[in-house]
């Protein structure tokens, strides 16, 4: 797999889902081997926070990265967009504690990356493809995530909610046959009207709105239309891609999740890291030729 970065910088700004704070993000090209990393430009000494598994701090309803001098939250949509675009070396400057939610999906990040363009930093293979040789799994109650040996990369996700408009949904995605930009990136985050007040009282979703999240109740969707009939499960798969990209090298495997969470995604990534020899350098992207443009 080869190293890629963006051709030119781009900027986006918006409100953070949980903090409710408006932040600006500037994404810039990086040199080969620098990897994907955040820089808190609003803090003294502008601390660097690598987008690596070792820096994961907490995962309630989002994924947060933390270094000794600073942290950044809700990184999963931007990281998924970078991964889905094949970008593995990039500097991400942010002037606040949380990545903007934008419209609740990864679509605007994908569009910004496409507009910026991509360049290949090296013309030689920088790391071999990592493969899963035996099943690796984590479980909590009836929720689980596992990685199965496979000849091609695949992600399969299942969800089951007691809201009739969602119910039980499954979706399986093969990057070689469907592009991330078309099949996954447009899927928005979702929530439930009867949980909004309790989440806000817990200090969460302060920036959530009908403009950046799908909301449903037991009667139906509060803010239709959906972009896909199974948009909720596609969004869960988006989150999984973003979380697994913190491994720096996503192994060739069939990843299967059911009723999982950011916490379980990260636990699987840690289990993989402890079992499979993963590059100690930067994220190498999906296996070569796994993505279509």
From Swiss-Prot:
Matches recorded under InterPro entries: Ribosomal_Su5_D2-typ_SF, UDP-acyl_GlcNac_deAcase, UDP-acyl_GlcNac_deAcase_C, UDP-acyl_N-AcGlcN_deAcase_N
Catalytic activity, EC: 3.5.1.108
Pathway: Glycolipid biosynthesis; lipid IV(A) biosynthesis; lipid IV(A) from (3R)-3-hydroxytetradecanoyl-[acyl-carrier-protein] and UDP-N-acetyl-alpha-D-glucosamine: step 2/6
Keywords: Hydrolase, Lipid A biosynthesis, Lipid biosynthesis, Lipid metabolism, Metal-binding, Zinc
Domain of life: Bacteria
Gene Ontology terms: cellular component: membrane
Annotated catalytic residues: 262 (proton donor)
Example of a GO MF term: metal ion binding
Top EC class of this enzyme: hydrolase
Protein purpose: Catalyzes the hydrolysis of UDP-3-O-myristoyl-N-acetylglucosamine to form UDP-3-O-myristoylglucosamine and acetate, the committed step in lipid A biosynthesis.
Official protein name in the record: UDP-3-O-acyl-N-acetylglucosamine deacetylase
Species annotation: Gloeothece citriformis (strain PCC 7424)
Upper lineage: Bacteria, Bacillati, Cyanobacteriota, Cyanophyceae, Oscillatoriophycideae
